[in-house]
Amino acid sequence: YLSWMFNGMRQFIAVCMILLCFGLLLRKKYVLTILVILLASTIHASALIMIPLIFVIQGRAWNWKTLILMMGVGAAILLIDPFTAFLDAALSETQYSDLVTNDIWKNDDGTNILRALFYSIPAILSLIGRRIVTRENSPVITLCVNCSICTAILYLLSVFSSGIYIGRLPIYTTLQGYVAVPWLI
């Protein structure tokens, strides 16, 4: 129990470090942001998921990059067995090298669908109010909306795969969704 608790604490420290980079993302200071992400990954390796995501979340809300990410996750869900083989190969040299082959992954039935739906509310609200989000074109809100879309996509993937491993990745983009919710309502 203690190892899981301390692992969660380490991950949240990494999340907070990356959240501090929000202003850097708004100013498109990618090199500095990546350096902070790499520093955060020394605390928790899952922080590395943010390196590709910082490029996905840039631009207009519901842009082509987020749609491609949606299609990629949809394909991963449909092809879950090859996806887990890819994940196992990708993580082979990290602290998560036994991720796919261990008993926890095999016995994990994924994230609860209600949890995934709850955390998808900011993305759903932004889809409903897409015209308003596009018209306002606020850099803060578009970045937060795109983070919300990534949160929904990652939670959807965790419903069909591992709630313990994949289900903890959305925390890196969930907090920005909380910024968007009051604006979207």
PLM feature segments, named:
Residues 5-12:
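Short acidic/glycine- and proline-prone juxtamembrane loop motifs at membrane-interface regions
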Residues 165-183:
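Hydrophobic/aromatic-rich transmembrane helices and adjacent perimembrane loops
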Residues 13-16, 46-47, 176-179:
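Residue-level signal for the membrane-embedded core of alpha-helical transmembrane segments
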Residues 1-4, 32-56:
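Membrane-interface alpha helices of multi-pass inner-membrane proteins
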Residues 58-171:
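Alpha-helical transmembrane segments and terminal signal-anchor/GPI-anchor hydrophobic tails
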Residues 18-31:
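Membrane-interface transmembrane helices that cradle and orient dolichyl/undecaprenyl
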Residues 4, 20, 78-82, 152, ...:
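Transmembrane alpha-helix boundary/anchor motif
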